[in-house]
């Protein structure tokens, strides 16, 4: 197909929210064919950069993208939030927001509700978050990383517990590695959240097929 046909097809996907639908249907199909979702969910988010410059046709930044401070650096763009199964690594839930939305805000969109274990970094820890977790997944135990405070440093036991939790949480980084480093989605391709969200959901669906799709495709045998 030529470039015009491809562009029309992309617009069709965007207008009908097909990227999100594709992600949901492929996830359901994989689960129906043996890729089980366990009781553990790991949540995390990654930043996708957008151009901060106003040197463009509109002489303005994308109004749907926002900036956030991470460490000592400011980042402008959006976030991809995911809920990943702690055993299989299947991305079963996702949401897309501007970069300034706090990671913990999206937890209700990232859990399936039957969790018995909830993993996340220290950004997902806190009293309000624990109360929210009880409402969404009442049987889930909180395995988020413990945070140190100014007058309350972590004990050696706390540090060791955090290391064990982090080794489990590493599964959530694999989809981000494919998405950003292998497939080049470290920066937004379009203006606006909706277009980039459609691309993100479609790519997450493709990642699930890449990593877990053998039950659907079977073995490829030579003729």
Predicted ranges, named:
Residues 1-139, 145, 201-207, 213, ...:
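Polybasic low-complexity intrinsically disordered regions
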Residues 182, 186, 213-223:
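A short, flexible helix-boundary coil/loop motif
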